[in-house]
């Protein structure tokens, strides 16, 4: 019978015997080859989120549209985003060990990560279900949408464990350079969600409850698929159910790198909760417009986040392999490509704002408010690029605390100060959303200065 040591040796030999293009191939090609599956995967993830909004908005009403977005989306992001941030520590650790061909350590990281997903899923389910009404009231959710919003968020958190397992499993696959299969799983999940949305919301008239049920069932499917692939692989990241447990030292390493990213996500979302509360105070029409904008706006975030994930894995594997020149070239290349993509998307969204909004609602007042928001924010997208790419780069080398502090001060604290001081002087949607480009600009400048002058990858003053 084959021993664990023999299995590890064979897995290592499998990796050594094949060329790892991420550390040897043409940089821009490798970034794009990794980027596109992540982009399309994120697109389908956003598509099934948008499907809820489109179907309930068109077939149930603007109150239902507000219920499945707005405050519920922000609260979901608060908890799920914290976990995804923590799980980024696993992605970084696995990518570095995989780049260094350390099979045993990859195995410890994989099984600890899945164990963490299971425990976190149970905890998040309990918190989400019990705290939902209180949290929605705290955010000044309008009374006419409080009931359906509570229903949606409670059903969502009852099935949240599928989301967490998928995100962790997809992160493991991306860490070893496989960004295609997470895409395939999301396509299957998205199509399932759309079919179930139509069946539950339109066919069975289940309203927001049907939309939530469709979402958690489709997420469960993606979780099953990603676990199936991890269990069938012959590579060093193979998952064996009997080995799923916490390794204390590995868990500490994962949390040490992932906790800053998790806290960063919480701080982002906490400041967004304050913003959402300010938006809620402007009425249901503005909440509906903001909800629809968040779905349109997701086009930008899925592009920039896909580049952020790509550069994290690229940097992690090349840093693990000791190829520092490729790290620096990769950062420059990724920044340039992201800038081009951002400008192109901004032009398209700005010029087709009305068409975008009419996908979600035909209410003239909601569309008018939404176009005003979009025309103000879209031209400022470019100010965020450096935050995503440089924070992803620094996470790739395990430097995550300083980026968290930069984001805390530059984004969260400054955003809160703006909302508490400027909005009372002029309580208007543009005053509220101005907090985004203001904080993006300040934080981007701080990231550039840290990366060039003070980080482990610093360019200025670096010994040659």
Language-model-derived ranges and their functions:
Residues 56-77, 143-148, 208-209, 250-257, ...:
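Interfacial/gating helices of multi-pass transporter permease domains
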Residues 65-126, 163-182, 289-353, 384-407, ...:
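Small-residue-rich hydrophobic transmembrane alpha-helices
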Residues 45, 49-56, 80-87, 91, ...:
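Alpha-helical transmembrane segments and their lipid-water interface positions
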Residues 1-35, 94-159, 203-259, 315-380, ...:
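Short alpha-helical transmembrane segments in multi-pass integral membrane proteins
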Residues 33-52, 155, 166, 189, ...:
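Transmembrane helical elements of multi-pass membrane transporters/channels
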Residues 24, 28-47, 51, 75-82, ...:
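Residue-level signal for short hydrophobic patches within transmembrane helices
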Residues 43, 47-66, 136-143, 199-206, ...:
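Helix-terminus/linker motif at the lipid-water interface of multi-pass membrane proteins
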Residues 87, 155-174, 182-190, 211-226, ...:
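Short runs within selected transmembrane alpha-helices of multi-pass transporters and secretion channels
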């Amino acid at each position: 019978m084959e021993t664990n040591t023999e299995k590890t040796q064979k897995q290592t030999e499998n990796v050594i015997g094949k060329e790892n293009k991420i550390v040897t191939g043409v940089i821009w090609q490798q970034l794009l080859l990794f980027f596109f599956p992540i982009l399309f995967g994120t697109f389908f993830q956003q598509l099934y989120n948008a499907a809820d909004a489109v179907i309930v908005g068109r077939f149930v009403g603007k109150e239902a549209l507000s219920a499945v977005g707005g405050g519920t989306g922000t609260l979901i992001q608060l908890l799920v985003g914290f976990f995804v941030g923590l799980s980024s520590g696993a992605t970084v650790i696995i990518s570095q060990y995989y780049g260094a061909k350390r099979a045993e350590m990859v195995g410890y990281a994989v099984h600890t990560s899945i164990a963490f997903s299971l425990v976190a899923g149970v905890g998040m389910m309990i918190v989400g279900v019990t705290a939902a009404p209180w949290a929605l009231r705290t955010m000044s959710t309008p009374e006419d949408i409080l009931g359906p919003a509570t229903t949606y968020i409670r059903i969502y958190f009852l099935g949240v464990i599928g989301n967490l397992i998928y995100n962790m499993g997809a992160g493991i696959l991306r860490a070893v350079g496989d960004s295609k299969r997470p895409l395939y799983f999301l396509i299957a999940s998205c199509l399932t969600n759309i079919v179930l949305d139509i069946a539950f919301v339109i066919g069975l008239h289940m309203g927001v409850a049907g939309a939530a049920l469709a979402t958690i069932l489709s997420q469960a499917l993606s979780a099953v698929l990603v676990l199936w692939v991890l269990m069938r692989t012959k590579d060093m990241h193979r998952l064996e159910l009997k080995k799923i447990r916490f390794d204390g030292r590995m868990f500490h390493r994962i949390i040490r790198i992932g906790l800053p990213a998790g806290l960063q996500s919480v701080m982002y979302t906490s400041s967004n909760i304050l913003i959402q509360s300010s938006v809620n105070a402007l009425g249901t029409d503005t909440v509906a417009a903001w909800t629809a904008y968040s779905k349109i706006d997701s086009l930008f975030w899925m592009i920039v986040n896909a580049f952020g994930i790509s550069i994290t894995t690229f940097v992690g594997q090349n840093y693990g392999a000791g190829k520092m020149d490729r790290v620096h070239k990769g950062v420059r290349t990724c920044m340039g490509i992201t800038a081009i993509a951002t400008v192109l998307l901004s032009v398209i969204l700005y010029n087709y704002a009305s068409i975008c909004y009419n996908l979600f609602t035909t209410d003239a007042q909601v569309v008018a408010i939404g176009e005003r928001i979009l025309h103000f924010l879209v031209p400022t997208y470019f100010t965020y690029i450096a935050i995503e790419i440089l924070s992803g780069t620094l996470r790739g080398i395990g430097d995550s605390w300083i980026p968290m502090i930069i984001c805390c001060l530059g984004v969260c604290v400054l955003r809160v100060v703006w909302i508490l001081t400027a909005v009372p002087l002029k309580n208007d949607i543009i005053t509220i959303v101005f907090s985004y480009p203001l904080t993006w600009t300040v934080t981007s400048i701080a990231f550039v200065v840290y990366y060039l002058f003070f980080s482990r990858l610093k360019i200025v003053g670096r010994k040659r």
